[in-house]
Amino acid sequence: VTIDPNLNTSINIGLVTEDGERTFITNRNGSLWKENIEHVNFDKIKEAKILSLASIFNCPLLDGKTLEKIFSFAKEHGMTITADMIMPRLGETLDDIAGALQYVDYFFPNYDEACLMTGEKDEAKVADKLFSYGIKNVVMKIGTRGCYIRNKDGVMIVPACKGITAV
């Protein structure tokens, strides 16, 4: 854990809709809006096996070029890279993060986010476009239907679990 006395910890309130999608209320004066590459401990990356970025576009100062530096370093050290995303905060596009996406092993956008980023509506076209950026496994969350997965071996839908009440 790194403590920066100049940053307030971000507080997020997560809201879950009936279809299981989540949205968050975030303090724009917290660390999520101020984190940058100087806060990344590259020595610790060398010790890990998986780098999981909770959300591309969540920290505006971790832009595409910055993520590309972090992800390429992680790949050089044999890490598996996973990344989720949120809707772009500053109008970013797929092309803004293209350099970083080529390093991602598992990418977890939801359908709405993926449609916005690709300009497509058809699940297959959305997943194919994301896959074309070099992502190894596109795992698109499709609400109550489950996940649409696209990789070099093809496509499959993993159905959502039924009868589970989230607490």
List each model region and its residues.
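Ribokinase/PfkB-type carbohydrate-kinase core domain
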Residues: T2-I3, G14-Y106, Y111-I157, G163-I164
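A short catalytic or substrate-binding loop motif that flags glycine-/basic-rich loops and adjacent residues
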Residues: P5-L7
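Short alpha-helix plus adjacent loop in nuclease-associated cores
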Residues: T9-N12
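A phosphate-binding catalytic loop at a beta-strand-loop-alpha-helix junction
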Residues: V167
